[in-house]
Each structure stands twice: as C-alpha cells, then as structure tokens.
Amino acid sequence: LGYGTGIYAENIGPGLPPGIVRQIHSLPRLHKQDVIIYHLSTGTALNYTLENYKGRKIIIYHNITPPEFFEGYSRHGVEMGKDGLRGMAYLSDHADYCLAVSEFNKKQLQKAGYTCRIDVLPILIPFRDYEKKPDRKIMSRYAGDGYINILFTGRIAPNKKQEDIIRMFYQYQKRYCAKSRLFLAGSYDGMEAYYERLQEYVQKLHLK
C-alpha cells in the first residue's frame, strides 16, 4: 500500500532472520502523522515512555498473566505481572485505539480506564508452521505399540494449570484406557519449583 513500516523490539528472539526486527533504540524520529502499533503484554519500561513518541497510538493487548498465579513459584513472575498491570493502566490515557485478543482482555482494558474504541481480534495462527513431517525417531519409539498418546504443548507454568491436565489424564487412564501416555512438551525455565510440584503430584497419583 506504499506505507513505510518497521518492526522494533526491546528483546529479539534468536529464531528470527537477521534484520527483520530492529532494536527499539534504533527507531527513527517519529512525526504526528505516523502510527505506532504497540504490542502490550508484560511489564517493560516502554509502557512508560510510549507517550513520548509522536503519532497516533494503537495498542494490541495480548493478556497479562495475573501475578497471583506465580505466588510461591517465581518472584520474578509476580513482579513482571504486577508491573505489566500497572503499565497497562498507565497507558489508558495514551491510546487512540485498541485491539484485544479476547472479550476478556477487552473488559480488562475497560476496567483499567481505557475510553478509546476497543475491538476484539483473535490471534491469527499461521497453520503453515505446523505443516511439518513428524520426527521419525519419535514416531518409531511411541507409535504402533497400542498406546494412546496425549500431547500438551506449552510452557510449563502455574497459569497453564498442568496439574489439571495430569488429573484428567489420571482419570482417563484409570477409567477408560490403561495403555495411555501423557506428554507435557514445554520449557519450565524459571518455573522449577512448579515443575517439582508437578513431579510430586505425579508420584502421589502413582502415575508412571
């Protein structure tokens, strides 16, 4: 459409091709006719400096995990959640338009004092990323032995409630299919205490 665009971030993941995303400090000077699309999620100093940039501001709100989920497991998680919620409230007077990924998130913004127009736009999933051939070694190890395999993918964290998945699997294995396996595929980096609690729960249920 002829618009000049760029993607800038505070932290850039290693999986992205070089040059696609640039560091926020390299953002050029903006003008009042520019538009900033700001992805609001966790606590960051950018929440308190966004107002200093010229141009209209569109905020995409992609949920902030309530800090109470991390109580007893991660002090960092608690502080990040609290700071994120404070930043979300601080930005309420600096948004010209908002997109929330769910009705729940829209209500969160309204409760935090946002008075601009807020629409809901669910997360668009690039299904092409999942069009991959399965790993042969894993398939040969777990396929064809008569077991039902149940897979959950996602970060191991209290807000994901993996204990509920384990509880569900326990009932499934006990009542319906003894020859079954549960895979929880995800990193527990920073959530080691929660991971240990899950291990204890598995032992308590005598699951293997």
Describe each PLM feature range.
Residues 92-136, 144:
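Donor nucleotide-sugar binding/catalytic pocket of nucleotide-sugar-dependent glycosyltransferases
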Residues 133-149, 173-177:
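Nucleotide-sugar donor-binding and catalytic loop/hinge architecture
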